[in-house]
Amino acid sequence: MTDVATQTADILINGIPFSEFIKNNTIESDISDWDFLKDNSDTERDTDGDNDNENENESNNVDVCTNISPSLSEQDVQGLRESILYCIDESVRNNPLSFSDPTFHIKLENSIYEVIEYTFSDNSFTSIDIFAFTEEMENQIEEVITTCLEEYFETIVPPRSYPTTCILQPPNVAETVKKIEYLKSIPQDEQRTAGWYIFRNKLITASAAWKVFKSESCINQLIYEKCKPLAANITANSDDVDDIEREKDKEQIIVEKTFVNTNSPLHWGQKYEKLSVMLYEARNNTKVGEFGCIKHPKYDFLGASPDGINVDPVSPLYGRMLEIKNVFNREITGIPIEEYWIQTQLQMQVCDCDECDFLETCFKEYEDEAAFIHDSSSDIDAEFHLTSAKTLKGVIAYFMKDGKPFYEYAPLYLTREEYDRWCEEIIDKNAGITWLKNIYWYLNQYSCVLIRKNDIWFESAIKKIENVWNTILKERETGYEHRAPKKRTPKKKNNIPYEENTNESGCLIVISDLELNI
């Protein structure tokens, strides 16, 4: 049978710890009805009360095992199935927040096996143990458990995620049109603009809400970030300055303070986000629309900025949300990590989307154009866009505009002739700004999995989020300084004159810490 070594101590059933449940609420109530446990041993046991002979006891045990049916009858299977479905449902509904755990399904399955093992090894209510099962019976039990889990997560509650993206059913076009039109009608600032930062500061956003479900330290950090002023040097008092004017002051300061470290993982993700959208649209023959920061229609302290939503009415993906993560150095497993799973769930709730494609991409960059051109699958011009490993490659033109990075993305699947022409045309198109270089990329990994909206999880999660938000509102008035991170004593640095320190690295062009704090 499946290894049950995975810890299940954090699972509750009927509101009590799992370890207590399997002692007091196992499936023993159904055991008397299962034919494969009827060993007829009552007629074979010593009725004279003389059970001191060890050989007789061993003989009885052998008789019990030999009288076990070699397989489960249909009645046995049905009884087992009903009990397992009950255990699954109780576990899920008593542990809804556990869905965010990437090992959720493994823990749940192992807990079911543990119930079975404990039930049939407890001699207080059955005369056999699990090790007396035949191989055929073990296979039957394993098949029943697997089938029950599949049926439950197909019909009752959606699984945490699917192994890949897929179409479960065609979209309701009429209903989806109304949803998208409503989202478009909501006033919203473009992502990463000053107004966008200001609006997000008034909310707990989907991308930061994961901290609510982590340690006290993470919760403390979130409260501190939301309490402190958006820009440190804004000191305007609400009694002295009109609200609208104060918002304008904030916006101006934000614009002035927005610096972008082009070497950071954050900027890497932003740089390749549009390219990931292009790939997704091309692979799925769809169109992705952009949206700003949107507030939940009921819970006004919760907001989300989805990377996009499929807006092509003829696409089978119409209305499906898209969340993108451009991996810098993390392994892509196809299983969304906890922080990202929570983010997608909250985004779907805010935008009333039932499904989300969670896309992870990993791009690598060539050293120069020569390496880019050399890495080709063949000399055929039509395959110029393919690497020697048959993966996609392309080019991004990197400009500087108003002191900030600006990128132009070459169309996908270019021939060599089209590539040469695009490189010339893009320079002419942006003649008024500074061209820095071309970035030559290739696709190293592409993973897209489907995540469905989980209302059971959200019903429990929103209560915890609201509690933290109430604390934020309170401490904005009463004081939050006690939550400030403790300052570490800086290490002693060498006293090297600035003129002589010529080994500084990195390109700090123009991002403040605002995005990381919101």
Name the predicted role of every residue range.
Residues 1-518:
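Accessory terminal regions of nucleic-acid processing enzymes
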